[in-house]
Amino acid sequence: NQISMIFQDPSSALNPVLTIGKQISEPLRRHKGFSAQQARDQGLSLLFEVGLPDPERQWSRYPHELSGGMCQRVMIAMALACEPALLIADEPTTALDVTIQVQILHLLRQLQKQHGMALLFISHDLRVIAEMADRVAIMYAGDIIEETSVRAIFERPRHPYTRGLLKSRPSLTEISGQRERLYHIPGNVPSLHELPEGCRFLDRCPWPG
């Protein structure tokens, strides 16, 4: 009950053969012991809180009848059902268009403050990380290689991989009338079955030794 999760693709995370109401009622009845009517009342309240248009109407609909943004709001409502202390959001905006992404990010920040919960946000989008995070853990090949404040990551990155990651961001600035060539980190991510000894970034590191 203390940990909930929002998945990357809400359309595939929701059960296609169950109504929205059935899916949001289940955790309330199973974990909170609510009656069917109590679960419906609380479920509708949660759907209203996450900004789903016309919750009463959506209650009896199936996931395929909702847009991606609406499905993600349903997933967020389900995640909040048991009042978690920690909400894990795994790439929650990747499958959404840019306008809806902004709305969902704003909603998550708002809900985090209202519910007083911790938010663990997993993303490859550095722009989103800059907006959402207080502290950042950078992972490479399944290993955390740097952990610090979000400001320090962008202003004073310490690990070579973090530096390369920031350097590889697309730039629109031009030099002598030409755009800069997009930087990439040479080499490939190692297989998790054949990891190098010591630092996992060693084979791709521009400053070995």
Language-model-derived ranges and their functions:
Residues 102-116, 127:
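Helical segment within the ABC ATPase nucleotide-binding domain
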Residues 38-57, 166-167:
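Conserved ABC ATPase "signature" region
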Residues 81-85:
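A short, proline-enriched helix->beta-strand linker immediately N-terminal to the Walker B motif
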Residues 149-209:
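Charged, flexible cofactor/metal-binding loops and thiol motifs
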Residues 129-131:
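A short, surface-exposed alpha-helical micro-motif characterized by mixed small hydrophobic
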Residues 135, 147:
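Short, glycine/charged-rich "phosphate-handling" switch motifs in NTP-dependent
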